[in-house]
A protein has these predicted regions:
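Non-transmembrane, aqueous-exposed alpha-helical and coiled segments at domain scale
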Residues: 1-203
């Protein structure tokens, strides 16, 4: 078992590829269709994360669909209509599933507690590890991100530990500002606008 939510997403995609599924257009509800005459701005929010993408993720420990900006384009958003691509990343990493992901340091249990890291669908505790900077940069490049928000800074600030991986090397910082500076400098070549959020409010 891969540790998915077991809510039936993969069987739905299997039906689609086998051409036996029900298309959304067949059960159209006009009341919920965006009125083209409004010409408003649309913010598309993707679920899950880059490394769960069916093509770019850690296969087979992936979801059944596309978690990249390509998923929006595949579903009818014209590429030229996209003005900004926002990336949202935790300043540490989490994962729910059957593969071994969490490090052996007991501090990860503390991060899980402070960050309330439990699966949104199943309530399972998320495995926690330090930010993989190489993977982050890959996600930025593949998606063409031009605006990047790091959240959960408040969690690391509360436990007073700021670490990340760059390749096989772990970098340990003495304060939050040092970690933020390092990340900002290392991402200069991507020309991405970066915001570090320590907002504790629930969304």
């Amino acid at each position: 078992k891969l540790g998915t939510t077991a809510k039936g997403i993969a069987p739905c995609y299997s039906d689609k590829m086998a051409r036996v599924g029900v298309m959304a257009g067949s059960i159209l509800e006009d009341d919920y269709i965006w009125d083209e005459e409004l010409y408003g701005k649309v913010l598309c929010e993707g679920a899950q994360g880059f490394y769960l993408d069916i093509d770019w993720g850690d296969y087979p420990y992936v979801t059944s669909s596309h978690c990249t900006v390509g998923g929006a384009i595949l579903n009818g958003v014209p590429p030229k209509a996209i003005r900004d691509i926002w990336g949202v990343a935790k300043v540490y990493e989490t994962y729910v599933g059957s593969k071994l992901f969490e490090g052996v340091d007991p501090i990860f249990a503390k991060i899980r507690e402070v960050g309330e890291e439990f699966g949104a669908t199943t309530g399972r505790p998320r495995q926690v590890n330090w930010l993989d900077f190489d993977l982050l940069k890959m996600a930025i490049n593949i998606n063409g991100v031009n605006k990047l928000v790091f959240n959960k800074m408040d969690v690391l600030d509360e436990i007073k530990t700021w670490n990340l991986y760059n390749g096989i090397n772990m970098f340990e910082f003495t304060k939050s500002e040092d970690m933020q500076y390092w990340i900002t400098e290392m991402l200069k070549d991507t020309d991405v606008d970066i915001v570090f959020s320590g907002n504790k409010d629930r969304i």
